[in-house]
């Protein structure tokens, strides 16, 4: 319905301590259109500069990407969907995830002066996701 006002949903500091987290309070209906925005940074643990961008991390490995799961879009990297609108074909909850090989030391702690590899997190806050649903 073109007249339907968008519903805006925010997830501040999505869970990055496991592969996938379901957010049952954010439900989609068949036919929804979802505009996806996301940003910020995550503590990936380890040694040295360990904060990485949530959407498009600068890293020597193929890890540390934020993931999204919408009905019909399972474990997709946010990097390829931010700034786009997707069509939801079936009902279901939001699932957000994270790519890593050691989830136990991830989070949003010990930022201090750690702006990440190559200062990629300079001026950025903690990770977030915003969805506009119509």
Give a label for each model feature.
Residues 1-134:
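Gly-Asp-aromatic-enriched flexible segments
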């Amino acid at each position: 319905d073109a007249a339907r006002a968008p519903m805006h949903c925010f997830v501040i500091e999505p869970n990055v301590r496991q592969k996938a987290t379901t957010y049952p309070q954010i439900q989609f209906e068949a036919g929804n259109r979802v505009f996806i925005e996301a940003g910020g940074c995550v503590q990936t643990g380890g040694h040295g500069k360990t904060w990485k961008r949530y959407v498009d991390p600068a890293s020597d490995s193929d890890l540390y990407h934020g993931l999204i799961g919408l009905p019909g879009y399972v474990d997709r990297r946010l990097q390829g969907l931010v700034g786009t609108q997707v069509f939801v074909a079936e009902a279901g909850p939001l699932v957000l995830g994270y790519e890593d090989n050691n989830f136990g030391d991830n989070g949003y702690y010990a930022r201090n002066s750690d702006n990440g590899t190559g200062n990629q997190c300079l001026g950025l806050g903690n990770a977030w996701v915003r969805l506009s649903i119509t």
